[in-house]
Amino acid sequence: MRVAPMTSRFLDACRRRPTDVRPVWFMRQAGRYMKQYRQIREKHGILEICKRPDLAATVTLQPIEVLDVDAAIIFADLLLPIEPMGLKLKYEKGEGPVIGNPVRTSDDVDSLSTTNTDELGYVGEAIQHVVRALAGKVPVVGFVGAPFTMASYMIEGGASRNFVRTKKLMYSDETLWRRLMGKIVDVLAPFAHSQVAAGARAIQVFDSWVGALGSDDYVRFAAPYSRALIERIRSTGVPVIHFGTGASGFFRELHAAGGDVMGVDWRINIDQAWMDISYRSAIQGNLDPVALFAPLPELRTKVQELLKRTGTRPGHIFNLGHGILPETPVENVKAVVELVREFRP
């Protein structure tokens, strides 16, 4: 399946083509910092919003209306694919995601299903709602987790600080690890394809926990599966954004796993990151999310410095180095969009 190309400022930048101004959008641009989102969350839980296409579409569209950004990332949850695999997912207040039956043994891996991804059809329905509402104004971005991050959640049973269980399995039974990672890819790839079929015109692969690894372990245990996933997504013809948190120490290795666009967190200067990969992909990022709390003069300076670092080379998409934080002043987010649009190198 290959989709017909769509023209937009954001997609042009993904392909390293010249744009009139720098495209801008934000990870977690739909979230608690917005009053409109908080009003919906007062009545509905995270998973309920994700599984109701009407609500997911409404939340996805809110930042387009409020911020006038250049892309609409679908509102969903990274861990949704683990449910059709047979795992029990819930959200505990103050704890984040909790998996009731984590994967710890060979039997656990054997029991994981890879054939029920049609149960995630509600995400595609939400994308279709958003595509209709936008009527070509901006493209929709779909997303999946990277295999290492998904495996970490599945093994740990939720978020982790040191990833002891994950690394213990990885080091002690490499065969089992590779079976698990292969199954994860076999679920994530068709899920990404279904998002493209529904109308997504780019897919972001989030490797939220990859910073737990060193360079050698990344290359050995994670990169082959990220590469396999990205190659399968790219077969649809849409650009893939590859974003890893805390990966500045092995950014070249991350890039070697693939991606039309490489997302950068705030821990490395974006010009250095781009140079490190010889400008062979577009680059996305990388304002520190906490900079959005700065007074406007300081925020203006930071935004302009970042934009100057990427110069006039086509292929920079302005974003944060991670998601927007819940307490962020919405007026500051709006100000960043205006500053990016006004910037002239």
From Swiss-Prot:
Its EC number is 4.1.1.37. It catalyses: uroporphyrinogen III + 4 H(+) = coproporphyrinogen III + 4 CO2. It comes from the Bacteria. GO terms for molecular function: uroporphyrinogen decarboxylase activity. The record marks 77 as: Transition state stabilizer. It comes from Solibacter usitatus (strain Ellin6076). It is found in: Cytoplasm. The keyword RNA-binding does not apply. This is Uroporphyrinogen decarboxylase. Belongs to the uroporphyrinogen decarboxylase family. One of its GO terms (biological process) is protoporphyrinogen IX biosynthetic process. Pathway: Porphyrin-containing compound metabolism; protoporphyrin-IX biosynthesis; coproporphyrinogen-III from 5-aminolevulinate: step 4/4. Its main location: cytoplasm. Homodimer. GO terms for cellular component: cytosol.
